[in-house]
């Protein structure tokens, strides 16, 4: 019987982890003897203090400082360079109000985040930045130890909270996402997917697992994807055949291409939720979910008939244990079928509350909606972390200038601002969009399920596409130092990349949106309100066109009139839906006439529909993007309009304006070719965008950056402490010392550099 020799038990850490822990303790002791421990301890404490303050703004205390800060007198700038004169002092920046307004969680829910933060503060030996040079097995061990600590020792997560207070559960999970996406995914697999699927697809008989899920005695995994099938879940080949003589299901992998692939928690799981084709007698009832034991929960030995392998090194998320699984005629009790939407009785008869197989299939995959909603939040966090690092770097990094004068902070260069600031505005749009999805999910009802499905698919695809592109550009804006793993931008790029295909390939998800747009086309054109569209409602195209005055606006500032830009994007969406629907219909009619004799009658409808869809696929994707952009714009506009705090509203209004101008610019080709805007106005648009960017003062940008993320990303090129205090430093040397400190605190493979040899033995931070 195969056995995991290196699998850590719940009672003791692995040998490699013990060795690593010993090395860390030895290094800490040596650093203490040499006076270096003050650096690590102080930084670690400061980072966790910042994290605590950020994640719980309701209890945040105003920091007393002798520095001049944005929260007191505006940003202080004593730079004696060729940069513009220091800007006038600003009003008190509403950090607390803005942070609270950006949060989707209530004060009570934020306490769950605070609990996670405090737990991390209590264990700096586990939650530290010195893990980038660990071996892969050490990374897996460390990730598992971190999860065990948060779940078993600190009780930060439970199935009961997930079931009865889902918003509180997601609040706690969000704190983990800020620290490490792989730790977040591993914890989500145990609770959101393993326990969450039992809750959503199972019945009373499956609640017996919950206590052991909380204690991690039963680690779980979630197996849909196969080597040959990812997006096409209907096509998976793993079978679950009912055996009447033994009242069991036989789980079987019929071919190597049917092996389950990318299965998270594969190194530690005892149980696996296996999606397979349910076969009763000679009839295939489609994809259902089964609880399949894969390891002995006491010995951790792999069970007979189960084969588990390692998918090995990935592009990112290296500290997440993804594996592959095969099943050789493994028998499980009939009760292990998650039977909420379909069951096999003791008499061996299949029954389901759904008469429509497609509706049943959709219900079976309901947990994917939760995954897509979670990815929207995680993707937005990834953008926020990279923005904070890049903005902090840009204020401190100095390059070029007038002869015999100090060099300029790179934030003063137009190219830097015109790249970063529009992405900052986009972040706030995405933050509110993710929050909107959060509220839809935790308050979901059968009536809102369709809207939730469409928005989670569309937002996940759009946000991850845009954010991956933005993070790559932000890396470039940090120059060569941004390439260093010490600053974690490259790690963020690698970890975030999977979000574009994780929980649904983005191209496929956009087509999910397209299906609903076409299905609701008749309602839109007859002026009926459609539950798929959460916007303000729609009008007949002629009416919309008459309201768009893009060719007749007096000047570019009129572009920021909400009546104009809301109608502009509604019109664009209407036109695109009408165009693609008409083209799809015409192609379908042509195909029906052309192959009337060549294709059997019983196959003709499906074949023609498939081919017609493929011929308009690119246009369908463009239409889905138009829908998502319109929804995000509506959400951002409404959040700014409804903001109760005057100063916060003014700050967000400027971000909304920059987002609107960027969105119009992105779609300007469409507006020009469809006579919705004139070439002259497009030129004015570029100037207006530059004007809005120029109006954003340093103190305002630092104040906004303060709300992005806590000081937990461990990027030495960013002065997070300065951002938190609103201080523009005139001395960038701590940033460069930070690079050296981080390098020396990680494993040195060559050379003779030490804290002493480079003069850092007495540095104070």
Give the residues covered by each predicted segment.
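Flavin-dependent oxidoreductase catalytic core characteristic
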Residues: 2-765
